[in-house]
Amino acid sequence: NGSICMDGVDIREIPRDALRRNIGMVLQETWLFSGTIRDNIAYGVPDATDEMIVEAAKKAHADGFISRLPDGYDTVIGSAEGGGLSAGQRQLIAISRVMLMNTPVMILDEATSNVDILTEKRIQKAFEELTKNRTSFVIAHRLSTIQDSDLILVMEKGDIAEQGTHEELLRKGGIYSTLYYSFDS
């Protein structure tokens, strides 16, 4: 039992539209809609200028691949599958979207699970920018995604089994340490 509060207010008391404006999410399964890349990035920020959209994409490390597309930001993508974009490119567009939204709270749920190592590195750099100076919840199985976190909660069977920084958890020699060294070898 308990409650989740934002600035001391129980979220059950906050209107749903206000919550949506204050929480940005990048999920494992990225959703894009039919339209241009520009429109997909600007979703949720109807008054976004081209400069704001490009700046968000640059912060998300997406501008490079977008600029190389024949129509750049005006490239039309056809569906949730992203119309020919790789999983990593779709994730970078989703990250660009939440960069533009600039919400005080971020939820990143397995956002690197479907990408290759090189794309993961690019997404990691984007996450560093995205999570700077804001409350962020990062749900991850890839420990590289969370190593720089201020606090890591290790879950086991629905309960918090361990908590601490990366270094503290390695020193404890528990579940996190076992996972880390098994992935490292």
Give the positions of each predicted feature.
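Conserved ABC transporter NBD signature motif
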Residues: G2-V9, L19
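ABC-family ATPase nucleotide-binding domain "signature/switch" substructure
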Residues: I11, R20-E29, I37-N40, V54-A60, ...
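Conserved H-loop
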Residues: D63-P70, Y176
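ABC-type ATPase nucleotide-binding domains, specifically the catalytic core motifs of the NBD
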Residues: A42-D50
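The conserved phosphate-sensing helix
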Residues: S34
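C-terminal boundary and immediately downstream tail of ABC-type ATPase nucleotide-binding domains
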Residues: R171-S185
